[in-house]
UniProtKB/Swiss-Prot annotation:
Family: Belongs to the phosphohexose mutase family.
Species assigned in the record: Mesorhizobium japonicum (strain LMG 29417 / CECT 9101 / MAFF 303099) (Mesorhizobium loti (strain MAFF 303099))
Positions of disulphide bridges: none
Keyword Membrane: no
One MF annotation (Gene Ontology) recorded for this entry: phosphoglucosamine mutase activity
Cofactor dependence: Mg(2+)
Example of a GO biological process term: carbohydrate metabolic process
Post-translational modifications reported in the UniProt record: Activated by phosphorylation.
UniProt modified residues of type Phosphoserine: 102
Chain's role: Catalyzes the conversion of glucosamine-6-phosphate to glucosamine-1-phosphate.
GO terms under cellular component: cytosol
Protein name, per record: Phosphoglucosamine mutase
Amino acid sequence: MAGNYFGTDGIRGRANKFPMTAEIAMRVGMAAGLSFQRGSHRHRVVLGKDTRLSGYMIENAMVAGLCAAGMDVFLLGPIPTPAVAMLVRSLRADIGVMISASHNPYYDNGIKLFGPDGYKLSDEIEERIESMLDKDVELTLADSDGLGRAKRVDGVHDRYIEFAKRTLPRSMSLSGLRIVVDCANGAAYKVAPEALWELGAEVVAINIEPNGFNINKECGSTHPAGLQKKVHEVRADIGIALDGDADRVVIVDENGAIVDGDQIMAMIAESWHQSGRLAGGGVVSTVMSNLGLERFLGDMKLQLHRTKVGDRYVVEHMRAHGLNVGGEQSGHIVLSDFSTTGDGLVSALQVLACIKRQGRPVSELSKKFEPVPQLLKNVRIAGGKPLEEAPVKAAIEDARNRLGKAGRLVIRPSGTEPLIRVMAEGDDPQLVEAVVNDIVEVISETRSAA
């Protein structure tokens, strides 16, 4: 079973295939449990999942491994990833586990791990756990009288709803707003509509009937067309699209236009900067964020800090440099005044707060900058390392020279899927399209020749 298990966001893959098998899930439970046993107290784990069919298999395998390591497991059921991060702290647990493949289709699944502070594990801790997966950890498991127990915990949805509501001022009501929320048939199908309704909004909820197979299927933050249509149909003020585990959000304005993570960060950063709440003199995002965001922040004398892709790296940079707004273009928004990880619902509430404070529609509030022409294409690969091939290296170097200082080029393997992502941006859209197509063509030819 030797191999790399962890990617940019935990362990992820096709359910019941390496590395997302019941056996490996059990061993991850054992290794994680042994890694976080400190002190003589009873050790606790909170374990949540989204709505995939394979969640039952992975959940039970994880419980077996964690209990074998002497950990008591609190089962949360289907619940958003940020709720797991919050409940790790609230329930004084040693570890948090979320079983989800986020925005991926139902046939994938994954395991995300959180430390006792509610933050995703560092690369170093993941490497330590990974190193144990291929070893005989059974030698260090709990004695028969020290095994863990598993129990279902009631009221966790209400805890998270109250947490989300508290991120808005108590005096603020969403009364007068008609909101369409697309829950992607995922983990937030109960909590998101309820939280918005309790805050006073008129709520139209769609994709709230998970069946194990329809999570993210033509819905949610990666497929917002249905939400756009519904916003038009009911004449809503705003549409909110979450993904399968509700750690990312995409907004649709009253005209049906999409507002991505870059524009959401710009909106929140400007509002917090004006109120004196923005910390650290800037915002943290990744290499994928649009150059327009960087220029917009620069006009306010704010800095855009860039990290490699993955909200975990955004959070690590935020913590290291004292910033409280960060995120990704894809819609992972991290507001560290409230959360330790991306939280789609909480981020949407901050957008709604901007609407209520300023009394202006989303279409006006979200047009903070004109995006620089940007094109992203994915090339599916069967294996190997095409980026190390000489023709691909030459094509990339040529593209950088053609773009010069007027643009950016980002080429990277996906950390969650067998893809090479090719992104370019610059003020000349024809040049951007040309360099992306040239690189994609060379990678495809290299892949075919392999």
